[in-house]
């Protein structure tokens, strides 16, 4: 049920993104969509490490884009369209209601004892998490991890070089 909700909200933010015309509003929608996609990948992988790293990479790119947009865009205010917001909330609530009515197990999920369920889930998560992390750092996938580390280092060096005060595209105009 959680995945269906995230899929629906990702679809709605994608539709809203096409209707935006201000760069800061588009950046906000892109950040919200990045959070949703990171949550979806974490739910699919049973470990949130990969989605956390993915979110940090996207957030670093978004910060660089935010610097460019704030230095180049005008100082006009932006506001969300009330019509678009109400339509998206209506669609999202309809998907939620239809999902609850069609999926009877989602109703029994709210009736269960939450304390015992959380203890059981924590125990299962700890057992599966150690196996997933071993798979991440063993032979076939350790090359991908090293490649990701090198990519992040090169990106960090490039961003530092680009954002020097008197060199590059971010220098002040006189």
UniProtKB/Swiss-Prot annotation:
Cellular compartment(s): Mitochondrion membrane
Alphabetical list of InterPro entries matching this protein: ComplexI_Subunit6, NADH_UbQ/plastoQ_OxRdtase_su6
A GO molecular-function descriptor: NADH dehydrogenase (ubiquinone) activity
Record-linked PANTHER family: NADH UBIQUINONE OXIDOREDUCTASE SUBUNIT ND6, NADH-UBIQUINONE OXIDOREDUCTASE CHAIN 6
Family that this chain belongs to: Belongs to the complex I subunit 6 family.
Primary role: Core subunit of the mitochondrial membrane respiratory chain NADH dehydrogenase (Complex I) that is believed to belong to the minimal assembly required for catalysis. Complex I functions in the transfer of electrons from NADH to the respiratory chain. The immediate electron acceptor for the enzyme is believed to be ubiquinone.
Protein's recorded name: NADH-ubiquinone oxidoreductase chain 6
Organism: Ceratitis capitata (Mediterranean fruit fly)
Primary gene name: ND6
């Amino acid at each position: 049920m959680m995945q269906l909700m995230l899929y629906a909200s990702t679809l709605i933010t994608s539709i809203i993104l096409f209707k935006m015309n201000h760069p800061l509003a588009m950046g906000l929608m892109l950040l919200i969509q990045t959070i949703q996609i990171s949550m979806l990948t974490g739910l699919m992988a049973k470990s949130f490490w990969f989605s956390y790293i993915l979110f940090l990479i996207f957030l670093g790119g978004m910060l660089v884009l935010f610097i460019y947009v704030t230095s180049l865009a005008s100082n006009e205010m932006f506001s969300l369209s009330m019509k678009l917001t109400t339509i998206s909330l209506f669609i999202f609530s309809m998907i939620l209601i239809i999902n609850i009515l069609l999926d009877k197990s989602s109703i029994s999920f709210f009736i269960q004892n939450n304390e015992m369920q959380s203890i059981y889930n924590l125990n299962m998560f700890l057992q599966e998490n150690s196996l997933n992390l071993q798979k991440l750092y063993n032979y076939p996938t350790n090359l991908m991890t090293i490649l990701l580390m090198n990519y992040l280092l090169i990106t960090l060096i490039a961003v530092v070089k680009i954002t020097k005060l008197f060199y590059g595209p971010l220098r002040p105009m006189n």
